[in-house]
């Protein structure tokens, strides 16, 4: 899929984060109810789409230790639910996510905190569902990792991405593997060393941001377009695509074996493809997979 900049009412980017009137998720889901709340997040679900809203705007949606653990549990739970096909992650207020919560005690529980963050990013990366980061504002440090560990990323033009840890004597230890994987070594290293703000247009031109919207309204529109496209993606095929792309990054002799295993699994009797090909032969090219019972997703 290729997405292009969607134009709406023009906004002038500012070095500082913009202050949107209301967050995009709230408008996008105005017809839905919040299904659950936690300490720093809200969850909404409609059909096969789950939306997770980071809701600590007074802290820039920073990742506290408890929030990191809660988000990990959410992604693990939704990964195992066959009724869930897509997971949207976005933020409330001015920021998408300002990274690790520096207001907490970092030095007494360093190992515990590191493991919690690794578990979070690992849970998102391994999630068999399609994950979409809807980046409503600036992202710092771990917030950059939170965006780019997701499969699809769309951002408002007034956002930016800053790996600012080096200014504090820190480094983006837990997210570096994902940033290097998605951005490439050269840009990732420069961003880490300089703490420079990386503009969304730069990442869009590289193909690692899949859309840049000029304002909140346009961000909602492009999110709807992405979700509409994903309605026709079979869940097991989606999970396999994600496994293959993860493994291909470190291609070795195991990849060919994995490819054979997946190919053999996807063409057996009772598989998704048996149903999908049969429907195609009947002229149905847009299958609503949410209405199809699947044997296994993972």
Curated annotation (Swiss-Prot):
Disruption-associated phenotype: Leads to drastic reduction of ACT-toxin production and disease severity after inoculation on detached leaves.
EC number: 4.2.1.-
Domain of life: Eukaryota
Swiss-Prot/TrEMBL keywords: Lyase, Virulence
Pathway listed: Mycotoxin biosynthesis
GO molecular function (one): lyase activity
Membership in a protein family: Belongs to the enoyl-CoA hydratase/isomerase family.
Note: Gene clusters encoding host-selective toxins (HSTs) are localized on conditionally dispensable chromosomes (CDCs), also called supernumerary chromosomes, where they are present in multiple copies. The CDCs are not essential for saprophytic growth but controls host-selective pathogenicity. Although conventional disruption could not be accomplished due to the high number of the copies identified in the genome, the high sequence identity among these copies is likely an advantage for RNA silencing, because it allows knockdown of all copies of this gene simultaneously.
Function recorded in the entry: Enoyl-CoA hydratase; part of the gene clusters that mediate the biosynthesis of the host-selective toxins (HSTs) ACT-toxins responsible for brown spot of tangerine disease by the tangerine pathotype which affects tangerines and mandarins. ACT-toxins consist of three moieties, 9,10-epoxy-8-hydroxy-9-methyl-decatrienoic acid (EDA), valine and a polyketide. ACT-toxin I is toxic to both citrus and pear; toxin II the 5''-deoxy derivative of ACT-toxin I, is highly toxic to pear and slightly toxic to citrus.
Protein name (Swiss-Prot/TrEMBL): Enoyl-CoA hydratase ACTT6
Species the sequence originates in: Alternaria alternata (Alternaria rot fungus)
Gene symbol of the encoding locus: ACTT6
